[in-house]
């Protein structure tokens, strides 16, 4: 049975970058664990803000967070109130100085993580899984995705036996290194149990000279 390699890990250092960027010897394990807890806390705090990616950089005891979100206004707040509150909460919880940068996602319909979370939200609202998948796929294609694949796994439609179903439109070349593949995963907590949602979005090929730049 063939298994899928993670699209980010497969392309790290080629056309994808690490989401935690720092070097350490003695504190490596504690930093990895702290990064996990920071992401968990920020995701929980900003769950309604369409947060796709949390990048972490460390230098001289300071932590820099780069948040990619579809709704930057909610993250920043009026006159920067919300972002200052988040910075203060993080400083109090983790005893470190934080700086936060917010990047807007112009097209959330072609961001795999946001698409996966959108499908999971629909499943929790009891929308039929096939309808949710097809509607999302057609929307992503309309907004410029060259290809998209969506997979749902679990007790679909309340079935006794768990299974997985997937739907694809366009090209999704997972083994082509120069392909710009975005990947996202989300979980739908339904009355029948958890349904896992995976999304792969192909945004086009990145040529060698673009990678070098």
From Swiss-Prot:
Tree of life domain: Bacteria
An example molecular function term from Gene Ontology annotations: rRNA binding
Ribosomal protein as UniProt keyword: yes
GO cellular component, one term: cytosolic small ribosomal subunit
SMART domains found in the cross-reference section: KH
Keyword Glycoprotein: no
CDD domains in the cross-refs: KH-II_30S_S3 (cd02412)
Task performed by this protein: Binds the lower part of the 30S subunit head. Binds mRNA in the 70S ribosome, positioning it for translation.
Protein name (Swiss-Prot/TrEMBL): Small ribosomal subunit protein uS3
Native organism: Oleidesulfovibrio alaskensis (strain ATCC BAA-1058 / DSM 17464 / G20)
């Amino acid at each position: 049975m063939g298994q899928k390699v993670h699209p980010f890990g497969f392309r790290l250092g080629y056309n994808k970058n690490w989401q935690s960027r720092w070097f350490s010897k003695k504190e490596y394990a504690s930093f990895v664990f702290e990064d996990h807890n920071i992401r968990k806390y920020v995701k929980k705090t900003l769950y309604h803000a369409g947060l796709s990616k949390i990048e972490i950089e460390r230098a001289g005891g300071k932590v820099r967070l780069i948040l990619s979100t579809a709704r930057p206004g909610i993250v920043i707040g009026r006159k920067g109130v919300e972002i200052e509150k988040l910075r203060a909460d993080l400083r109090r919880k983790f005893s470190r100085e934080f700086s936060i940068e917010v990047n807007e996602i112009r097209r959330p319909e072609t961001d795999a993580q946001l698409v996966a979370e959108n499908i999971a939200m629909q499943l929790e609202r009891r929308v039929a899984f096939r309808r949710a998948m097809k509607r999302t796929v057609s929307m992503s294609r309309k907004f410029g995705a060259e290809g998209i694949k969506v997979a749902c796994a679990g007790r679909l439609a309340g079935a006794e036996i768990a299974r997985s179903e997937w739907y694809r439109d366009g090209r999704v070349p997972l083994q082509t290194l120069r392909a710009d593949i975005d990947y996202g995963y989300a979980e739908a907590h339904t009355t029948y149990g958890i349904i896992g949602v995976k999304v792969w979005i192909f945004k086009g090929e990145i040529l060698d000279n673009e990678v070098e730049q």
